[in-house]
C-alpha cells in the first residue's frame, strides 16, 4: 500500500513523504493505513497484546531451543525494524496511542496470566508478553529518552532470556515440565538453583540487578514525557510479577518436591553461556 501510493521504497524518500512534504488528499489515508498494517504486523510478531494469542501454545509446544529463539531473535529484529521505519518517518500521534494501549494491555495481561500458570515454559511465555509491554513504553513516549531506554531494555531482556532458557535446556534432560518439578533443584543442584533465582529476581526488577536498571530507565522515560499512568501501570504490574517469580524461588528452596529428580550436570557450552549472562545480570549497574 505504501509503495503503491508513493512509488518509493527508500527510507529517505519515505521520510519526506511521511513528514508531509509530498502528501496530499486520499493518498494520505492509504499511506497511513499501510503504516498501521506495518505496526500491527510488528506487534503480532513481538507478541504484544491483543496480538499475543499464538505465543503461549507455541512456546509450550515447540522444542526448547526453538522457544528460546522465538523469545529473543524476532523481538530484536522487529524492534530494530520499527525503529528504522518510525525514526525516518513521521511517528504520528495515532501510532503513539497504539503502542500506548498495547504497552498497558501487555503489562497487565502478562502479569495476571502468569500467576495462574503451572508449567515453566508457559510462565516464561506470559513473562515475555509482559516484558514486551515494558519495552513498548519507549515507543509510547516518542522521545529520544524513550528510544534509549527501549534499546537498553531489549538488550537486558535478551540476556535475561538467554539465561533463563539455558537453565530450562539443562532441566530438559530430566524432562522437567511443571513448576512443581523444581522442588528438588536446590537440593540436588544448588548452583543451578541460585543462578535461576538470580535470573528470576532480575526479571522481577529487584535492585541492583540488570532487570531493575531496565525498568528504571523505561519508567523514568515515561515520567519524562508525561505518561504518568503508563509508569504507574508498569510499577503495579512489576509488583504483581514479583509474586510468580518469587514463587519459583520458593518452590526451589523451601518446598518439598512431589517427586525427586536427579538433575544431570550441564555441558561446558551451556555452563559458559550461563556464567557470562549471569555475571552481566548481576554486575550491570551503571
Regions found by a protein language model. Name each.
Residues 1-286:
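Alpha-helical transmembrane segments of multi-pass membrane proteins predominantly involved
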